[in-house]
């Protein structure tokens, strides 16, 4: 817990609304309306009863600060999984009390300023922790205590400018620099000289976008915690903030496989596009919108937005993003059975992708899917296997899907392939660990078809899981694969049924895309 003394702060208000403070004489925690009680004394050298003068650290060490605070580190009770946290109650120079909770392990801000903190965490027993800290310290395992100066405050305008720089690094995919900005800004948020809900909402949105960026190289799912922290009311009268809110919300829906919801949110964001003046940000949005239309099999709209994105990205020399656009254009040609044109696009992009391992691996994976579409399973196997050797692709979420694809094409060629069975179980376990529903179903259907020889009841139940989650694209693809399997087994009635299902849901996705227009 961090409780700031009144050094360097505005005078304490009278009556209700006063905050707990550390007495300079007794070293006790004084709480309005409660008797004075002993408080853990700070462990810095020198007398602890004397309050440091404004802007002066103990023993004459000069520092710029807005006050002093007692900082307690502690382990949370079991319901917070025993992670290390620091809880603080900070008195700002602008007569406002700030509450927050910092995770020591990741240095990420988990709380917001002001009363909203309690509103956000009331259902998670955070008030209980606060009471334990303030009035029942003997029940909480305090791990350390120290007197530290509060860092220099920062204005919302300067913090907002920092966040803009951070977001630019994210858009340009400068991962290391973006990570540095994340760590720096995560600390600066605690030093706001006055609360600004718009800046905090902007911070939460960019933090979520950062998580989407780093997900490419981490085998874990992105959680919408920072997105949920945004006060939607703050976006109503701010066009740029509204754009970012709907854009990021759309990305999360797409990430979760809810393509219809994602496209709806993207179309709302498109109405706010005039408030965006950064051309690279516009290009990123058009790319995501084109990607969403591709998922709906609305290829005309997808190509239009992807070409707009390429034009804007070329002006900013964002090579890797141009490669991603070209990857989708080639995938569209594959879906339209224009295999020769798709091959030229893929090979051209592949030649430029060597310096970008993440995109390089995705291109190899896309080439594997292209070969699956053409029933060239051996070539598909080679591309999937090569993709897993590039960069950190094998450790990423997309890498789990590639492992499932590789196991699938190997088992389709030889159902007794022990290495393929091992790889399938590895992909299945990884997908289960992070609740990657689509990959879990793909693994289960591969197992049912090629290891358990087409058990109808298992196939039906797994496909139903996709329908319940509205994964219509995945349903269509897997139904088509099942139809091909039964066709090879000369079970034409079953093959016809599943092919009809595949066509139905492919058409359904096209209709949804038209409705969004």
UniProtKB/Swiss-Prot annotation:
So which domain of life are we looking at? Answer: Bacteria
Using the UniProt annotation, give all residue ranges assigned to the region (Disordered): 1-21, 33-62
Map the TPR repeats onto residue numbers. Answer: 283-316, 361-394, 476-509
Which Enzyme Commission number(s) are listed? 2.1.1.72
| Regions annotated as coiled coil | none
Indicate, by first and last residue, each region the UniProt record lists as having compositional bias (Basic residues). 51-62
Q: Which UniProt keywords apply?
A: DNA-binding, Methyltransferase, Repeat, Restriction system, S-adenosyl-L-methionine, TPR repeat, Transferase
Q: Which reaction does it catalyse?
A: a 2'-deoxyadenosine in DNA + S-adenosyl-L-methionine = an N(6)-methyl-2'-deoxyadenosine in DNA + S-adenosyl-L-homocysteine + H(+)
The record, for Pfam families, names: RapH_N (PF18801)
Which Gene Ontology molecular function entries are recorded, alphabetically?
A: DNA binding; site-specific DNA-methyltransferase (adenine-specific) activity
Q: Which GO terms describe its biological process?
A: DNA restriction-modification system; methylation
What job does this protein perform? A methylase, recognizes the double-stranded sequence 5'-GATATC-3', methylates A-? on both strands, and protects the DNA from cleavage by the CeqI endonuclease.
- This one is known as Type II methyltransferase M.CeqI
* Native source organism of the sequence: Rhodococcus hoagii
